[in-house]
C-alpha cells in the first residue's frame, strides 16, 4: 500500500474536492450561520428573460439534476415552497467549450459559460461582468442568468500546494462548466498545473470516483482534498 501511494504521480480531483458543498448558500453567509457549515459554492442571484421564473427554475433544475451538477441543491432550495412541479431532462449532451444541452418537455435547454453561449451566437447583455455566471437558453433564446460564485477554501489551497510540492499532478474530473485550470489559478492564487482532459474523459473519471475500486492502499478518515494530499 505504501509503495503504491508513494509511486502515485497523479490524483483525480472532482468538483466536490475543489469546492466542497457543505451547506450550499443561496445568498452568501447569514449572520447566524456557523462558518464551518458554509459551502464554497453560492448562487447570489438570477435574472429571467421571457420566462416565468418557476418555469425557468424547473428547466434549470431538470438539466442540473441529470448532469449531477453542484447547482442542483441550490436550485431546489430556491424552488422550495414556490415551484410545485418538476421536469425531467432527456438526451443530455456535453460540449468541449463549456456547456450542456438536453431536451425538457420537447424544448432544447442549454446551460453553460459565457464563452459557450458566444460560440452558439447567443446575444448576452453588454454590461455583463460575471466570470463564473451560468447562462441558460430555451430553444436558442436566452432564458436565465445565474450568478454563481466559487469561494476558495484554505484547506483546498493547502492541498493543491502540497500536491505541487510533492510533484503530484491533479487530474480534473470536473462537471462544472466553469471549473477549469484558469478558475483554479484565479481563486487559489497558484498554478497547480492540473491535467484538464477532454469532457468525455472528465465525465468517465468522475463516474469512476463514485464507484468502489480495487483493494484499498490507505484509509482516509476525513473528507476533502487535504487529507488525500497528505496521504499521497
Please state what every model-predicted region is.
Residues 1-59:
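Conserved catalytic phosphorylation-site environment of P-type ATPases
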Residues 26, 115, 149-150:
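A generic structural motif
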Residues 33-96, 180-182:
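ATP-binding catalytic core of ATPases
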Residues 91-101, 115, 127-128:
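ATP-binding glycine-rich phosphate-binding loop
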Residues 106, 143-232:
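Conserved ATP-binding TGD loop and adjacent catalytic N/P-domain core of P-type ATPases
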Residues 140:
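Flexible loop/N-cap segments at domain edges
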Amino acid at each position: 500500500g505504501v509503495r503504491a501511494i508513494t509511486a502515485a504521480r497523479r490524483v483525480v480531483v472532482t468538483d466536490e474536492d475543489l469546492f466542497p458543498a457543505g451547506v450550499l448558500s443561496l445568498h452568501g453567509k447569514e449572520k447566524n450561520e456557523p462558518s464551518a457549515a458554509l459551502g464554497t459554492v453560492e448562487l447570489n442571484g438570477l435574472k429571467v428573460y421571457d420566462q416565468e421564473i418557476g418555469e425557468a427554475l424547473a428547466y434549470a433544475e431538470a438539466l442540473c439534476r441529470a448532469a449531477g451538477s453542484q447547482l442542483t441543491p441550490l436550485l431546489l432550495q430556491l424552488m422550495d415552497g414556490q415551484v410545485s412541479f418538476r421536469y425531467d431532462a432527456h438526451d443530455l449532451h456535453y460540449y468541449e467549450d463549456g456547456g450542456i444541452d438536453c431536451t425538457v418537455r420537447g424544448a432544447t435547454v442549454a446551460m453553460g459559460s459565457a464563452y459557450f453561449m458566444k460560440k452558439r451566437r447567443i446575444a448576452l447583455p453588454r454590461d455583463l461582468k460575471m466570470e463564473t455566471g451560468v447562462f441558460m437558453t430555451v430553444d436558442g433564446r436566452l432564458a436565465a442568468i445565474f450568478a454563481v460564485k466559487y469561494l476558495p477554501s484554505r484547506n483546498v489551497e493547502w492541498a493543491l500546494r502540497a500536491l505541487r510540492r510533492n510533484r503530484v499532478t491533479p487530474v480534473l474530473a470536473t462537471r462544472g462548466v466553469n471549473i477549469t485550470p484558469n478558475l483554479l489559478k484565479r481563486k487559489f492564487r497558484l498554478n497547480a498545473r492540473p491535467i484538464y482532459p477532454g469532457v468525455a474523459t472528465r465525465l468517465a473519471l468522475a463516474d469512476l470516483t463514485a464507484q468502489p475500486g480495487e483493494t484499498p492502499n490507505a484509509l482516509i478518515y476525513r473528507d476533502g482534498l487535504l487529507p488525500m494530499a497528505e496521504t499521497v
